Every structure is written in C-alpha cells, then in structure tokens.
A protein has these predicted regions:
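A solvent-exposed beta-alpha-beta segment
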Residues: 161
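Extended, compositionally biased non-globular segments
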Residues: 177-179
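C-terminal-of-GTPase-core extension/linker across diverse P-loop GTPases
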Residues: 4-157, 166-168, 181-194, 202-217, ...
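Short beta-strand/loop segments at the ligand-binding rim of alpha/beta enzyme cores
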Residues: 172-175
C-alpha cells in the first residue's frame, strides 16, 4: 500500500469514528406535520435575524416537508387555537418555556431549542441525568457555567445573569457560580458540584461529547441551559416527554 492509500485509509477510518451531529428537530416530525416555533424578540435577540438554532429548525422542517408557524410567546395559545389540527410539536426558547407551557395543551408535545441541542450536539440522556444534581445543591457549592463561544455579554445575559439568579432563587442556597468561556474549560472539574453547559450551537457534537466525557470521567454531573431552565421553571418532566429515556434517567437520578 502506497503512502497516499495509507493516508486515505487513515482519514476514512477517522471520519467513521467522529460522531456526527443529529437532527435538531427533524427526528420528531414527518412530512405534513405542523410545528409551532416560539422565538421571543428581546434585548438578547440579534437585530434583523434569528439565532442559529431557530434558523436550523426552520431549515430542517422545510427539508422534512413539514410546516412551521413562527410566533412570539404572546401568540402561542391564539396560534394553536387557529389551527385546524393540533400541531405535532411546540418548540420554544427556554427563557419563555413557563409561559409557553401554560398556553400549550397537555396533549401537545413540548420541548425547547436548547433541549433539542442537547439531543443534537451531545447526549440528552446523560445531561438529563446530570440535571438532577441541581436538586441537591447546598450552601457553598461551586457551579460552573460553560459557554463555547465568546459573545459580548448582554445586559440581562442568560448565562451570567438569568441562570445564576433563577438558580439562587430556586435553591435558596448561597452558591459560588463561575463562568468559563470558550477554551477556558477547566482540566480539573472536581471542585464543581455541577456543570451547566450552553447549547453549543457553534461547535460540533464531537466537541460537546469531549466535554461530557471529561465530566463523566471525573464524576461531575453536566446539564445544559435548556434543561436547567426547564427544571428551575418547574416544567422539566413535561418537556422531556419527547425523550422518554432522558426522562427516566432524570427520575432515576433524583432517587439516588
């Protein structure tokens, strides 16, 4: 075998071992289904465009020959009522999930963009299991919020402001909350009680799984923004109904 053939064989072998991204929403729908996407326009929304997961969801639904209705959180109930048939799925921005859940009938599947990112980019079962660690936080526990991109923080930034505030309100504990941005992901994760990872929309599934495996190897639970927010808002079990194995993993972890 010549050097060129050897090199091609190595590249082909490596390519087969690299985990590919899963569909964000395409695995939950079929041709002809209707999906309601809830995309709030707030201070964190980019001017004149949608954020990447929202664009990705729309494209996947078009590729699946499904129909999508894009609304803000104050039009969910009205939009569902106007449909001739109930939507196959409602997918919302995590920050408005409690409001959307209140407007969505219980028999309509509900999820969030970030939870679907956990499915697409990482391992939603393992991250759901990690979410249970939030229920056992105590005073002085260290929590690490991990972001894969270095965006400019907003006035009411979700990772630096909202999640820490909601976490302290929910637990009533004096928590030490830190933020790691981009490549500043610690080698030693053992000081932390739990890791809260962003959706990872700008990185590959391989990158997210590397982080998840590093946490697992050190026995440190990892969850993500969407799972965390849904837990803090009291709707986690409902939004995990789309992923029964993840729901079971979360419930089992709570009882340990």
């Amino acid at each position: 075998m010549c050097i060129r053939d050897s090199r091609k064989a190595i590249i082909d072998l490596a390519a087969n071992r690299i985990p590919k991204d899963r569909a964000l929403v395409g695995d939950l729908v079929q041709a002809g289904d209707t999906v309601v996407l809830v995309t709030p326009i707030d201070t964190g929304a980019p001017k004149g465009r949608l954020i990447l997961p929202q664009v990705q969801a729309i494209r996947e639904l078009l590729d699946a020959h499904a129909k999508c209705l894009v609304v803000q959180q104050d039009r969910v109930a009205e939009s569902i009522a106007e449909l001739r048939h109930p939507p196959k799925l409602v997918m919302a921005d995590s920050q408005v999930i409690m409001d959307v859940a209140a407007q969505t009938p219980e028999d309509i599947p509900l999820t969030t963009f970030s939870i679907q990112m956990a499915y697409s980019k990482a391992d939603v079962i393992e991250m759901a299991r990690g979410t249970a660690a939030l229920a056992s936080l105590e005073d002085g526990d260290r929590v690490l919020i991990c972001e894969t991109c270095s965006h400019h923080p907003q006035k009411d930034d979700i990772g630096r402001i909202k999640i820490p505030r909601w976490l302290r309100q929910k637990t009533g504990k004096d928590l030490q909350i830190e933020v790691a941005v981009g490549k500043d992901f610690p080698v030693d994760l053992t000081p932390y009680k739990v890791l809260i990872q962003c959706g990872g929309c700008v990185v590959t599934r391989r990158h997210m799984l590397m982080r998840l495996r590093a946490a697992h190897a050190q026995n440190v639970p990892m969850t993500n923004y969407g799972l965390t927010i849904s837990y803090l808002q009291g709707v986690l079990e409902r939004v995990l109904l789309c992923h029964p194995e993840a729901l079971k993993a979360y419930r089992d972890a709570l009882t340990k």
